[in-house]
Amino acid sequence: MPEQGPRMNGFSLGELCWLFCCPPCPSRIAAKLAFLPPEPTYTVREMEAPAGTAQPPREEGSGEPAACSLHLSERADWQYSQRELDAVEVFRWRTERGSCLGCMFVRCSPGSRYTVLFSHGNAVDLGQMCSFYIGLGTRINCNIFSYDYSGYGVSSGKPSEKNLYADIEAAWHALRTRYGVTPENIILYGQSIGTVPTVDLASRYECAAVILHSPLMSGLRVAFPDTRKTYCFDAFPSIDKISKVTSPVLIIHGTEDEVIDFSHGLAMYERCPRAVEPLWVEGAGHNDIELYAQYLERLKQFISHELPNS
């Protein structure tokens, strides 16, 4: 999987003062600490209708034609053939806060019951993740739906905590409206910063399951590991929302995570009322859990044997 970004802690005293005192509000903390959008690795173009035919209808809420084509740059590190690329569906969808998001549907397993709504890390976009999605979906027998946060890839707007929550809300409704996938067939998967919108959405909607890959308790607890409570100026307070999640939750974390300490995964697990057996990957860091065999083994076990499949 592509690199998910540099360390979030280990700042100097001066840097920490700048982060949290100019002024100490969650949106500024979030923007300074968490969002590192790369230069876009893809473009989305409207597909022209054949001569003599009408333009395709516009999707309600998207503001864009239904049919678009995906064009990847060299930095996307595409690992498959044109046939797989042609099977990737892309479109744009508008959020309630006005951003127009790039969205992607990877039909890896047409006969599968489940679709994974994947919220990626803080330093990648859909172009970089596309190959990973195809490989993951094929191996766990699920289709993959993903989106770029505001200010990432082709998505308009700027990354912020409020936009993060609005973005996944829009993605949820796009998946349900455009593809007719019902909540009991949706698995929410968040990785790193992607666990933040995932927990927020899961605390408000019930779904088939939730997977939290290297989750964080809150922004302040990442920068200040000794923080024991959530302050009013903290950002991303997932630790206070996880108790409201009513769906089964699988938590995955590397014991040697150098970005979001392993203690975050443990704390989220202990606070979660519907947690299943977690996956603690001995020796894994923040960006290499997918390279360990037990990663796919645990996902397959969870989806194929611990969730309903009839």
Swiss-Prot record:
It holds the Pfam family Hydrolase_4. One of its GO terms (cellular component) is postsynaptic density membrane. It is an enzyme of class 3 (hydrolase). Its EC number is 3.1.2.22. Disulfide bonds: none annotated. Keywords: Cell membrane, Cell projection, Endosome, Hydrolase, Lipoprotein, Membrane, Palmitate, Postsynaptic cell membrane, Synapse. Palmitoylated on cysteine residues located in a cysteine cluster at the N-terminus which promotes membrane localization. The active site is at S192 (charge relay system), D257 (charge relay system), H286 (charge relay system). It is found in: Recycling endosome membrane; Cell projection, Dendritic spine; Postsynaptic density membrane. It catalyses: S-hexadecanoyl-L-cysteinyl-[protein] + H2O = L-cysteinyl-[protein] + hexadecanoate + H(+). Signal peptide: none annotated. It is a lipid-anchor. InterPro entries: AB_hydrolase_fold (IPR029058), Hydrolase_4 (IPR022742). GO terms for molecular function: palmitoyl-(protein) hydrolase activity. Hydrolyzes fatty acids from S-acylated cysteine residues in proteins. Belongs to the AB hydrolase superfamily. ABHD17 family. This is Alpha/beta hydrolase domain-containing protein 17C. It comes from Xenopus tropicalis (Western clawed frog).
